A protein has these predicted regions:
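The conserved Walker
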Residues: 14
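Short hydrophobic/aromatic beta-strand immediately N-terminal to the Walker A/P-loop
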Residues: 7-9
């Protein structure tokens, strides 16, 4: 590659929805255009060693944070890496694999924003923060069906990990440009989850107000400003017509990426069944908007789409 990769970070606790979101984006962007890196591959210890040391994979000391940052910097610069592989199926490490840079790098995992060195390497930073009750439900479903655990084992592991979740994972939310919480709607199915977004001014977001009916419109999208941040609530039961209007508003700002228009936005699977969520589709489209805004900025000689962040401390 002669130009750098545009880098998206997706951080959240275990079973927060990172893989679902990542797969959808890769599907739309095309596998030939996306390098996907899961930072779980940078665990320092395998499952047996973690048990012997009484340490969880959520703890920074259980991960090669320095190697993670070095590899992400190489990919961002358009350089290949030789990446470790962690196999969730049995909790062991596989052989190293060569990973080549592509137009986009999607990096998901537990500790992607833990250090300042890592945070500087992303063009777009997303954090997934579902309610704990819902996340626990998702983790039980996933780990029992795909990783061979019993329900009691999963719940016990969640309890054991909670101190590290509180200490190391959830605090990273403060560094995200976009925070996404999927929320259950009473009486609705899993493909009808509401989505609540916090949009921070570190990115220039689309103007959603042009297609909104008002802050308290029943059954519609709600928007508010709190402490300089935009809070957006997208109902899972959003009707298709209103969803299309909002999608068209975002696509209007992506005229240079119109070739990516796809009916597959918002698709996800539960077991072997394919579902579609309007709220998930809108979130994925918003992410595409920011990725291509950063792409255009870099192509014109800029640094990306980020706005200057305030100096703290």
């Amino acid at each position: 590659m002669t130009t750098r990769s545009i880098t998206l970070g997706i951080v959240g606790d275990s079973a927060a929805g990172k893989t679902t979101l990542t797969r959808g984006l890769v599907r739309v962007l095309g596998e030939d255009n996306v390098t996907h890196v899961c930072v779980d591959d940078y665990h320092r210890y395998d499952r047996k060693q973690r048990a012997e040391r009484n340490i969880t994979p959520l703890h920074p000391d259980c991960n090669h944070m320095d190697v993670m940052a070095q590899h992400l910097a190489h990919l961002r610069a358009g350089e290949p890496i030789l990446k470790p592989v962690y196999r969730h199926e049995d909790g062991t490490f596989g052989p190293l694999v060569r990973v080549d840079p592509k137009q986009f790098a999607v990096v998901d995992g537990l500790l992607g924003y833990y250090t300042e060195e890592l945070r500087r390497l992303y063009d777009v930073r997303l954090f997934l923060a579902p309610p704990e009750e819902l996340r626990r439900q998702w983790k039980v479903q996933r780990d029992c069906s795909r990783r061979g655990y019993t329900t009691d084992q999963v719940l016990a592991e969640l309890d054991r990990r909670e101190p590290d979740s509180e200490a190391f994972i959830r605090p990273q939310q403060r560094y995200a440009d976009i925070v996404v919480s999927f929320l259950p709607t009473p009486g609705s199915e899993q493909d009808r989850l509401d989505a609540e977004l916090i949009l921070r001014p570190t990115l220039r977001h689309p103007d959603f107000r042009s297609v909104l009916d008002g802050e308290a419109a029943e059954g519609g999208i709600r928007i508010s400003e709190i402490d300089g941040e935009t809070h957006l609530r997208i109902p899972g039961c959003l009707d298709a017509e209103r969803a299309r209007a909002l999608e068209e508003m975002i696509w209007d700002g992506l005229h240079f990426a119109s070739h990516l228009r796809s009916d597959r936005l918002g698709e996800f699977t539960i077991g072997t069944d394919l579902h579609r969520s309007e709220s998930l589709a809108l979130i994925q489209l918003l992410i595409l908007y920011h990725l291509f805004t950063a792409t255009a900025s870099v192509a014109l000689g800029g640094e990306g789409a980020r706005t200057p962040e305030p100096v703290t401390g």
